[in-house]
Amino acid sequence: MSKYRIVLLGTKGGPAIRPGGPWPTSTLVELGGRTIVVDCGLGVTRGVTDAGLSLKALDLIFITHLHSDHVLELGALLHTAWTAGLATPVKVFGPAGLNRYWQGFVQALEFDIEIRIIDEGRPDLREMVEVVEFGEGEVLRDGDLSVTALRVDHPPVTECFALRFEHQGTAIVFSADTAFFPPLADFARGADILLHEAMLEEGVERLVARTGNGARLREHLMASHSLAGEAGTIAARAGVGRLVLNHLIPADDPEIGEADWVEAVRKTWNGPLTIGRDGLVVVVEGDDARNREDLHETGDAEERFA
């Protein structure tokens, strides 16, 4: 089994941010010597650097779908890495439409890019980024690293994909945004880590009550996202090593704490469980990690098992 590190850079579902609250969705994965970012919601650039990683080390980026809380800061991340000295190409994988996003970004920043090439002698950012649009099936096979995609149920978005990363016997699966979707259990079968989105229904009701478009928002949330107990059901059916709740809805309700998430999930999942929070680090150091249930804290936001 490979050693790996997962850093939850942003754990909030939805694009809005509030004072003192968490950031939208992005995750750093270090696996098989590769530096991988999954989704690029607002705050991803600072999140990567706060995780102790140089932006010059960016290698692979994957976007699960084109909702803004998953893609808004992709361009800024790449541009900032470029100004920080990025000198090697970066591959960006995502659904149909991602290349249009990227071309629009570099067109909007054309003045800055051109003048930095001339004035600072930088390589051309536009030639350093390769955008690869994908559908279901194999996305990448590079040495011992493979990535596959499964189209999930996130209406009205049709191009939304769960991702499975595998390297030398280790498997990490991201649910992406999805309603309860039974085929995801087969896709995540035997994974060491399943990062699955989650909602708490009582929190949704309070969220809806304080928004101007409450009825429409509730309809969208209930049709397009998974309740915490449903995430537990997928984890149980898949037989994963650990369930990590991510993309939390709501993530910034002061009346909801970690115990509420745990209570909801324990109705369907009795295995190892981590409730996501910004900056949390999951580290695997040895070969028996899948069978360990007793993660222990090694810092303010690190969970490590061996």
Regions found by a protein language model. Give the residues of each.
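Binuclear metal-dependent hydrolase catalytic cores
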Residues: M1-A179, L184-D186, A259-A289, E297-F305
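Cap/insert and terminal regions of metallo-dependent hydrolase folds
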Residues: A162, A171-V173, A179-D278
